[in-house]
């Protein structure tokens, strides 16, 4: 084997070892992102909704900056209610760890009946938010705003 091939192989192995220690995002975040992509294909990366306005992403306060942000406020409230369901084994702030199943067919989202009550509630929260996002324009000016100034 050529020395150059050995160096490439060594580099790949080191990269894989490093990647193994990187924490994975929760599955629910990925499911929610896929739902958004189902309702808004090719328009806006779902990652743009992770830090938008006062309510999309971590932290929630103040008055929503626009209709997209209102979708996120409603989504936060929906997650809180889902976390209160008897038999739902998550705390409201851990609801992102709930796995659920759904189908996307030509922009239409359906939460599968195989979901338990908690999974169905979280799935429907994500479904409603994805549909809500599709109804309103995404304003790049509200991405990654200073929430301490704009969200009082």
UniProtKB/Swiss-Prot annotation:
Which of this chain's residues carry glycans?
112
What biological-process GO terms show up in the record? arachidonate secretion; lipid catabolic process; phospholipid metabolic process
Covalent S-S links between cysteines: 38-104, 54-151, 56-72, 71-132, 78-125, 88-118, 111-123
Flavoprotein: present as a keyword of the record?
Answer: no
**Where does the entry say this protein is expressed, by tissue?**
Expressed by the venom gland.
Matching entries from PROSITE patterns are given as: PA2_ASP, PA2_HIS
Report what the protein is called.
Acidic phospholipase A2 homolog textilotoxin D chain
Organism of derivation: Pseudonaja textilis
